[in-house]
Amino acid sequence: MGGDGPDRRQGEGQLRHHGQAEIEAPRVLEAARALAAGGLVLLPTETVYGLGADASNPAAVAAIFEAKGRPRFNPLIAHVHDVETAARIAAFDDRALALAAAFWPGPLTIVAPIRDPAAVCDLARAGLDTVAIRVPGHPLSRAVLAAFGGAVVAPSANRSGRPSPTTFADAVAETGDKAAVALDGGPCAVGLESTVVAVLDGPVRLLRPGAVTRAQLEAVVGPLAPADDDAKRSPGRLALHYAPDAPVRIDADAPRAGEAFLAFGAWPDGQGVFNLSPTGDLAEAAANLFAFLRAADRTQPAGIAVAPIPDEGLGEAINDRLRRAAGFVG
């Protein structure tokens, strides 16, 4: 078992998560058993909280779609414990293996031809001949995956179209009543969904920007091609997605009357102001984005204005989520 899994040196029945609170090993086993029985599990990852189910069980996968109100043409990402398991499920070429070596465990999803259709059922793949798969970087989720042994589909634990939950409280508020087991792994370190790339015939295509940036990917596989027709192979591509109840206005220099404001960089504190990063740090802004959208929405504003975010590095992923929250992507 890898170093991110259970630490047997810590004493019987305990796991340590990110150096924070100790997590009881029986809870990990309880989650694995719930998955094996066809139940849903609220699961932390480094990106966002997920609502997980056995990827091979069509009834369990259908329960996720029902819990989220998610369109069934939208494929789900399969999560596995290690690259060896991923390579048994998906057909990886040298480029996919290089990406896995560079970025796993971590926030990168690879779309590749399906090798073992029984491991990730047709419903989870939206009837496609490909599978979206990743090895998450959160020790608690990897411990559950190792105990379960198979693939777990785990879309964000929110109602479809809403901002993804990056705290346990927000995840429980969204879909906690649907889960047989709910695991608290603390705030999500990354705060944005994984980057998604398609590694099929032709050049590697960027289907969804995320925490692994374009520059980091191109350092491994060379120039990336646009998504084109392969966009349907990735989740998170709906025109209106990640949206709070209040309308979102992006690239705003200042809030209008009645609007909450998501600032970036130097901006005075004030009522209804939520600063994604006072220092202009894109990683901090990404980690805060969904939580601050939710916090702003709870003030019941006339709208939520968002300051301009540099469209470079991690900013590409932040702006993708903001454009979809505002309904500007078709």
Predicted features, each with a name:
Residues 2-15:
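Extreme N-terminal basic, low-complexity initiation segments
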Residues 13-330:
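Active-site-adjacent structural elements in enzyme catalytic cores
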